[in-house]
Regions:
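ATP-binding Walker
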Residues: 11
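A glycine- and Lys/Arg-enriched "phosphate-lid" helix/loop adjacent to the NTP-binding pocket
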Residues: 94-139
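ATP-dependent small-molecule kinase phosphotransfer cores
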Residues: 33-92, 117
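Hydrophobic anchor at the beta1->P-loop junction of P-loop NTPases
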Residues: 5
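Walker A/P-loop
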Residues: 14
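P-loop (Walker A) phosphate-binding loop of NTP-binding proteins
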Residues: 8
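NTP-dependent small-molecule kinase module
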Residues: 23, 138-171
Length: 171
């Protein structure tokens, strides 16, 4: 079983995927990390030197390879992955998808703690971040909502969320 975790930045994908990986003893694959390893560049460097179109094509290629070749893994997706090409359909066809949903307030609080490591918001004024997130969520929610399951992450620990996922999936 491939369990794909998706959601907006700050939704808890990284923390939950690590926790779930340990609980289920499934290897964890972080899609962005895999893209970075295969290109010998950080995601930021790929965007800067090769552009977003190149990145999105690589993202699709690596995603397809993982979904076609792996089994019994936790797959942590980038926040934008489900939005491009037919990625969301592919994710749903080849894995069990779980949308980690958080409120704009929660997402804002979480991403502001790591603002310098979040290229999308690094140059924004703190006061502009909630509106930026709300706009992005409005655009991305139609894709996120196609997930097999949705788990709310507000006020929950990674351990709580992982336990909820295990219960949902009956594993």
């Amino acid at each position: 079983m491939i369990i794909s975790l998706l959601g907006y930045m700050g939704s808890g994908k990284s923390h939950v995927s690590k926790n779930l990986s340990k609980k289920l003893n499934f290897p964890l694959i972080d899609l962005d990390q895999k893209i970075s390893e295969e290109n010998l560049l950080s995601i930021a460097e790929i965007f800067q030197t090769k552009g977003e179109i190149f990145f999105r094509k690589e993202e699709k290629r690596v995603l397809e390879n993982i979904l076609n070749e792996e089994k019994d893994i936790i797959l942590s997706l980038g926040g934008g992955t489900p939005v491009y090409y037919n990625n969301m359909d592919l994710i749903n066809e080849k894995s069990t998808s779980i949308f980690l949903r958080a409120s704009v307030k929660t997402l804002t609080e979480r991403v502001l703690l790591q603002k310098n490591t979040r290229p999308l918001i690094a140059k924004l004024n703190d006061d502009d971040v909630p509106e930026f997130i709300a706009k992005h969520l409005f655009e991305r929610n139609p894709f996120y909502s196609k997930s097999h399951f949705t788990v709310d992450t507000d006020s929950k620990t990674a351990n709580d969320i992982s336990a909820e996922i295990i219960k949902l999936l009956k594993i």
